[in-house]
Amino acid sequence: MMRKIRILSALLTVLMVFGAFGTFMVPTADAAEPVVRAPISDDDQKRMEDMELYLTSPNGQYELYMDAATGNFAYVCVPTGSVSFSTPSVSGRNTSAYKATVLLSYKSRTGYYNNSVTTLNSFDNASELGQVIIKRIKNGVRVEYTLGEEPTVYYIPIVIDKDRFEELILNKITVARDKSIVTVRYNLYDVTGLDPNSEKYKGYVAACPQCVNGPVYMLNSSVEATSSAAKNIAGVLEKYTDYSYEEYQYDTTKHNVEGTVGKTAVFRMALEYKLDDSGLSVSLPGESLAFDADAYTITAVDILPYFDAADKQQSGYAFVPDGSGAIIEFEDALYQGKILTIQNNLYGIDYATHVLKGSTREVFRLPVFGLVKDDAETGAREGFVAIITEGEAMGSITARCEGTSSGKVHAAWATLNPFVTDQYNLNYGANFPITLVSDRRYTGDFTVKFIMLQDEEKIAAAGLTDTYRASYVGMADAYRDYLLDLGVLSDLTTETSIPLFIETFGSVKYDDKILSFPVEIDLPLTTFEDVQSMWQRLHDEAGIDNVSFILTGFANGGIMRQKYPSSLKWTSALGGKSGLKDLVTFAQANSFDIYPNFDFLYSQNRNSSGLSYKHHAGRMIDNRYITKREYNPATQTFSMSNSTGVSITAAAYDELYSKLLKQYSKYEFTAISVMTLGTGLNSDFNDDAPYNRENSKMFTEQVLERMASDYKVLVSGGNSYTLPYASVIVELPTDSSLLLAGSESVPFVGMVLHGYKTATGEILNTAGDTDYAVMKAIENGVGAYFQLSYQNVHHLKDYVYLSQYYAVDFQNWYEEMVEIYNEINNNIGSLQNVLITNHEFLAGTRIVTEEELEAGIDYVTEVDNRIAHVEYGNNTSFILNYNYNFGVKVEYKGMEISIPELCYVKIVEDNGIYVSNFGGDKLITVRYNGTTYTIGAGETVQIY
């Protein structure tokens, strides 16, 4: 079979070279529609000379060529001739790691304070040692690596009598230099004539107990039987002496010592490659990872870290799912002369660990990353998008753009972290952290799917309809199609307005006095009747119908010290059962949804019926209960004493939901809110039943599936595993972390989900800048979300953990809420069922004001960032100027549009161009064909 593959590969190469790259036909698997082969460039063909064809996709569109010696490969799109290589073509010093398909990092388990990490790469530590094996498997190919040099044991004496050592070894070595190789590694222990009570005698005996029977030489403890020092000694003994294995056995037996072989770091693993009609899947099978777990722990395995990497001559960017999405422009790294890196775990903080990181950053909620690059010679733009399809809860994503003089490439990759490691500082007076490692490692598969992104001219030339353009928009299209193929997404029902979600608080425990006696009461913040009043006012006065209410703290004790929802008791002070039933009836009659909100992830009250911390609470590695520790921005730390709940193990969700359902199902609810299940994911290191985050993800999916079979489910954040079950996602990320390493935020999440999921952005009445938040809602296509209560809200400032809700008064916010809602709705209300089809950043010119001109300040007038252009599917688009301090002029479809600072325009193409200004009281000007149009607030003008 291999011979046939080699012949076919050679034939294809000959036909390409002598046929001037003329096209010919490659049959598909079913031979129904042959694929036209496009030429592969000379440079790519040269790199593929040592590779053989191993796999072809069922539709004949993709091929995988592989180098049997290294495991490196070329991933080919047949119709376009595009090739993605597993490793880049680099030269120079210290470049061997770039030739690796795997980077494996590990720590030694010996010594509490051993925190150093060693990294092996598959090129130096496997292929260069001849330790790569390629095997054919069903529908794929498996590449097996042995990372680390297999030990060779050298049999040299460990303890030997002085006379034997001198007679058999030292006296036989005639060259002084060679003799010193031996003598410097052995110490003489002779206690003859020494006082047994002397310190010298005791020291000798402690170091070498055998010396009490006579003088002996002992090998230095630093020399392991597999080390280079042992190799050098063995070489001298072989050259000059007759010291044999039998002599070695005699000495070890006489002196009762064992020839201990030093621990050698050797790791075995495999990558499995498969092709389907959409592209390449690469899997690290958990069963393939083998090593000495008593001696080492694996901290990270980077899978194809330099796949399709760009060199420093290419322009482009790397994409990571930081919040809404972020890109790192290669040019920014080069301009700054730095290495720009964005890296994070999937799904945010794991509170089961003592050391918490990433508190002020947005979460990586979708397991997607990618890279786009321009060919330095042809200008063709190509790249890839990668989706972690298995094991992502144990993974992280990295984008790294090397702009330093020594840097070689720009790349993006996924990493598996099979063990959870944690650090504790035992000495509070000094920084001596110890490392603890979870006993249980992830043993499932870690799989990444790579989908090619193609140059648009190549797509058109090949007549392809099932491939994706090389941009972050193409990445979003590919991921959306992937979710659609899985049945995760479905079209929204027809909506003509954006949703308005109001999360309202029920009650809070309050210290009061009755007849001078101190009592604790349930202080109402919003009653069931108040919810009806809020809906009625919004409906009657503002004409807003698409309203839903999230009821937080209406049961089980309110919003502080709330009991876990393993039981259910509606608060009497809010109207009790009868008030709730009236609200449910009212909601049904007026066709709006109510979502009672329950926290399944954390418990605020140990005295919850049906809940036992002993059986249901999650444990940290040191066996303490997992707590949700709050971040203190003043100290930039987390505190164990500053926690707001104990984490419940995900393994108990299903059991505890069953208890809630017995009572919840008695009411005519159509929906339920479990906000924290969409945003949090913790491990559980309980000794009796430990679970990693991948296990917790599975348990969360199971309970969400049950909930979704009975109710519409609302979650917060929208971690990817909730997408099949969540009807509504609030606080969907609409911005990135705005890290210094990032070049731009992009609405990747919005592009994927718009038209398929009902979603809102951040809480608008607590946003740092409402205008900015509104623009982000328009750019991402999300609805409005407010946290508001109806009465007694001034008391919230008296509570440390509730003082953040300083602006939740419904009456105070009513007019501004209606204004904000109408602004977003006027812009995108009619677009709820269409896709976001394109997004880009426009170049513009800074508008220098008269005051700035008079000040004589020299301004950079060219602006090439913070001007976003987003297009929706029905010929509607927006240009948004996110610059805070100045307006900009942009050219668009023959128009010169002047947009003030932190403002935007809406453009509709419908038998002409219509420009609208729905962004407040600032004026928009448009110049076209010598005519200037001024567009006031709320106005729409036809330009042509």
Model-derived segments and spans:
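Sec-dependent signal peptide cleavage junction
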Residues: 20-33
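Carbohydrate-recognition beta-sandwich/jelly-roll modules
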Residues: 34-38, 54-542, 546, 901-906, ...
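Loop/turn elements at helix/coil->beta-strand transitions in domains of secreted/extracellular proteins
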Residues: 488-489, 495, 542-548, 589-593, ...
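Hydrophobic core
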Residues: 12-20
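Aromatic-lined carbohydrate-binding/catalytic grooves of carbohydrate-active enzymes
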Residues: 497-655
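Conserved, mostly hydrophobic/aromatic
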Residues: 61, 284, 538, 587, ...
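Bacterial N-terminal signal peptides that target proteins for export
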Residues: 1-11
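Active-site-proximal substrate-binding groove within the catalytic cores of carbohydrate-active enzymes
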Residues: 64-78, 84, 366, 371-424, ...
